[in-house]
Amino acid sequence: MNCFIGDLQTKGSPSYPSGFAAVGTTTINAETPNLKRKGVWGYHPQPGAGGSPPLAKEQAETDTMAKHLLPLLLTLAWTPAWAQTPPDAVAPEGASAVLTEGGSPAVAQALAAKAAGEPVSADHWMVVAANPHAAEAGARVLRAGGSAADALVAIQAVLGLVEPQSSGLGGGAFLVWYDAEKGELTTFDGRETAPRAARPTLFQDDAGQPLKFLDAVVGGRSVGTPGTPRLMEVVHQRWGKLPWGGLFVDAIDLAEGGFPVSPRLAGLVAKDVEGLRRFPATGDYFVPGGQPLAEGSVLRNPAYAGTLRTLAKNGADAFYGGAIAQDIVDTVHGAEGNPGVLALEDLAAYEVVERPPVCVTYRAHEVCGMGPPSSGALTMGQTLGMLRGRDLGTLGFASAEAWRLIGDASRLAFADRDRYMADTDYVPMPTKGLVADDYLAERAALLEGDRALESVEAGQPAWDHARVMGLDDSLELPSTSHFAVVDRWGNALSMTTTIENGFGSRLMTKGGFLLNNELTDFSFRTHDAAGHPIANRVEPGKRPRSSMAPTIVMKDGKPALVVGTPGGSRIIGFVQQAIIGYLDWGMDVQAITAMPHLVNRFGTFDLEAGTAAADLAQPLEAMGYKVEVKDLNSGLHAIALEDGRLLGGADPRREGVAIGE
C-alpha cells in the first residue's frame, strides 16, 4: 500500500478492514540488549523515593488510593538526571516535573506506570496527552461513550489553557485519522496560512536583509491565520458522537476555577520574562505584578473560559468572524514595534484541507503521516526507505554503526527537504520521485563504507518539472504539543498541535489565548545565493513548511502504532527513532518514548546528555562526525495496538500521561 499526495500515484484513502492488528513481539528479548531493564535510559526515581511498581489494573481506583499514592509519585519529579540548558540555536522547552497537586486515580496509576517505565494497558480505549489535565479531559469523554473526535476537542481545549506556550486556539495542527468503520486513513491540514497582504519580503529589512530571528518572532508580523478551531470542528462534525458544546466543560471549569501552575510552565515563563512583558496583556497574565508565575500557584483565565463558551454555543464560525476575529486582528495590528498584516478577510476565508496520507513501507508495515506542507512523513519516509536493506535489529541501539546509517540517511533526506519541500498548493514538488524505490536505492548506496559522509547534497529525483529550487535555511523552533487517542470503536488519531515558538508571538488576545508565530517557519529569503527561488518562501495564503510528523503505523491494513512528538525540526528524528525502536529493536511502547536521542539533520550528531546516547560520542567522532551532547526534550506519545490490547506510553521528559480502560 502506497498513498501519497501531490503528483504521486494514489489510492486515495486506502481501504482496510476494521479492527486491531498484532505487531509481533515488542518485548526486549534475549537477543536484544536489555537497555530498558538496565535503566540506561537515565530516568530514575529521586534518591530516597523508592521504586513503587505500577498499580495493578484490577486494584480499585478509589479516591483514597489517589490521595495517598499521588504525593509519593510526585516526589519522583519527572526531571531527568541530565537536565540542563545547553546552548542551542533556540533553547528547547525544558524537561520538568509533573503537576504539583491534584489528580485522579487514573492519573495516579498513569504516573506509577511511567515511574516504573511500564506501558499503561487497556482493553477499550486509550488517550496519551502532554498534561494530566488534558489526558483526564479526553478520558472522561471516552469513558462517557465519546469518540476519538470528541476527545480531540476536549484535549485541545484544555491544552490551550494548561500548556499555553505550546498550542492553542491561536495556532495550527496536523491530524492523521484512522476511520475504523470504513477502514480508511486520511489526514487533515489545519496549518496556519499567510495573510493575503503578506509579501515574500515580509521578514526582510529595508536593505533586503533577513531580520534577526527573534525580532521577527515577537509581535504581529509573525502571526498566521489560526487553523486549530476549524480543525476541531471539522473532525467533530465528521466523527463526533457527543454534543459539541459539552466537550468544552472541563476546560471552562479549569479556566474559571483555576489550576496549579506546573513546574514546566513556571520554568518556561521564568526564562522568557522579557519577551512576555513586551506586551501588556501577556505580561499581566504570565508575569503578574512583575513576578513570573510561581510553580504551584493557582492560575485562572476567565477570558479563555468566555471564549470557549462562545465556541461551545456558536461553533468555530464565532472564532473566524465577529468579536473574537476582530480582537485577533486588533491584537496583531496593535503590536507595538512589530505589527502584522492579518485581516478579517483572512480569518473568514480559512479552510482546513483534507489530504491523502503519505505512506512508505518499512519492516512489513506501512508508516503513514502528513504530506506537504509538512515535511515530516516524506523526510522520515526517505530515511526509513534508505534503511530498509540494513539489519538494524542485529546491530542494536548501542551500535555506532547503526547510528552512522540512521544519521547519514537522515542527512540525505534533510538535504532533499531543504531544496524541494514546501506547500504543494503553491510550489511544484517531486513528491512521487522523492520516495520512489529506485531513487531511495540510489541514495542508500551513498551509505556504503564505515565513515561519516563528508558532505551531502540534495538528490535529483524523477520529476516532470524543470524548475530548479533554491536551498532553504529556515529555522523551526522546538516547541509544540502532541496527543494520541484510540477509542472503543477502533478509531485512532495522531495529532501534533502548535503555536510554533514557546509562547508563540507573545501576543495574547482579550479572549485569553496566545497567537502563533507560525509565519517564521517560512524562509526569510526569497532566493538562495545562486539566485534560485526558495520553495518555502512567503506567499499570500500559503502554508509554511513544517516538520510535524503525526504518524500511524499500519500492519495488514490496521493500526499497529500511533505516535508523534513536539521538537521542532528534530521531530522527524525523534519519531523515526521511536519507530525503529519498536520495529527493529523490539522495545515496548513506553521504552520507545524514553529511549535516549541521537539526531543528525545537517551533519552534527546531537546526543542526549546524561543518557546512553552520550556514550556513543567517541565512536561517532572516530567515524568523522562532529558531536554535540545536549538536552533533547521530546514529548513522544504513543499507543501500540497488540493482540486486541492497547498499550500507552508517555515521554518521561515532559508532563504527559497515558490513561486507558
Give the location of each predicted region.
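Short, low-complexity intrinsically disordered segments enriched in small and basic residues
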Residues: 11-15, 19-21, 37-53, 58
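Active-site rim segments in enzyme catalytic domains, especially the processed small/beta chain
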Residues: 161-168, 172-187, 338-343, 491-557, ...
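Internal maturation/activation junctions in enzymes
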Residues: 104-105, 389-499, 508, 519, ...
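Bacterial N-terminal signal peptides
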Residues: 71-80
